[in-house]
Amino acid sequence: MGIASSLRLFGKAPASYLFNGFRRQMKNPLMKKGVVYAGVSGTCAAAGYMFGNFVMEKHIYQVKYTEEQEKEVLEVENRLQNLKIVKDLRQNPSFRELRMPFNRSNHSLTNNLLSGPGRITVPPVIFYDKSTRQVYAIAHVGKDVGLDDDTIHPGLIATCMDEVLAICSFLSLPNKIAVTANLKLSNPTKAYTNHFYILRSHLEWTKGRKAQTHGTAYMLDNEDPSKSTCVAIADGLFVEPRFAKYLKHVIPVSLP
């Protein structure tokens, strides 16, 4: 069905008037350029949106490492998989395992900018229990994020604790989405680079769209991983936005 025949649905006179007016406007060079630009822009926008979704879905962001960096990653990954706590939690049927590949989200600090050799070396392994609202995260922090004395800035510890506490709050909120309303952190002792860290959190209470969580961070001894030192104690209050149900499609992590 052509444009003219389609417009006849509104009556003969309106159809003729609208179609003739459209033809006159299309003879204007500026109008033609506008239509062409609009078509090209719309096509590019649609293609970009579709490709972006494909990339996010298929995890095809490429990360290139040097030979030395690959050795570091493989060594840390092997040590991570052999940690006793990882093996124990993996065998515990109450816990589910979650691991988000690096560069899964362009808007994540720890999963993008701070990820890779010398930083957060490999993707942290996360275990969570929906029934008890407990979360464990095991991560390795490399030398490149350290200060002059090889200590880790408390801000990085606070960022990591905030994310682990947030995951814990997701387990108790209807739409599994929340934003940080308040975060309190104390550092009993210094944290150092080139160590594995265990971040733990549990739910204290929920009320409506609010969830209060508590967590701790432990630095494992490199010589004897069974020994650990508490480097952070945190309390976080998280609030689910009123429009949270409309944000599910933009959250890079889902908790099945």
Swiss-Prot record:
Key word Chaperone present: no
GO molecular function: fatty acyl-CoA hydrolase activity
Bilayer-crossing regions: 34-56
Location of this chain's protein in the cell: Mitochondrion membrane
Keywords for the protein's UniProt record, in alphabetical order: Membrane, Mitochondrion, Transmembrane, Transmembrane helix
Keyword S-adenosyl-L-methionine assigned: no
InterPro entries: HotDog_dom_sf, PTE-AB_protein
Family according to the record: Belongs to the UPF0644 family.
Membrane topology summary: Single-pass membrane protein
GO biological process assignments: fatty acid metabolic process
Protein name per its UniProtKB record: UPF0644 protein PB2B4.06
Superkingdom of this protein's organism: Eukaryota
Cellular component terms (Gene Ontology): mitochondrial membrane; mitochondrion
